[in-house]
Amino acid sequence: MVNSRAKGHNFENEIKHDLFSELGLKFQRDLNQYRQSDLGDLLCDDPSWPFVIECKRYAAGCQPKTAWLEQARRAARAVDLYPCVIYKYNHQPIRVSIPFAALAEALGGTCDEPELADLSFFGFCFVARELMSVRAAV
């Protein structure tokens, strides 16, 4: 049997390194997540980072669980950022769930719909880069 905490820790580290490779931004695990509720899993050293990241690694499934999305929403609401769930199931690629509003803002628009976009990891990195660029230009 796999230790779920170790599996989560390893996935958070994998994502931390992948984000650095793609975006050049440093992330660290938020160790307070075990002591306090409504915190994300990874913290970015860049204060303009627009997301609270929740990482989930599970054996089977095909989409993010509602509880994960709610957890990310609560954490994001507390710090006025966009929620983001980065998840992976065995034998499937990493996927990322973000609000339509984040995608719209990255493309120069707005969106009030509560819908979520499910992106590839690289698609998410594109949106994050564009969103940070749009905000820096304001």
List the predicted regions and their residue ranges.
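Catalytic phosphate/metal-binding cores of nucleic-acid and nucleotide-processing enzymes, i.e., regions
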Residues: 1-138
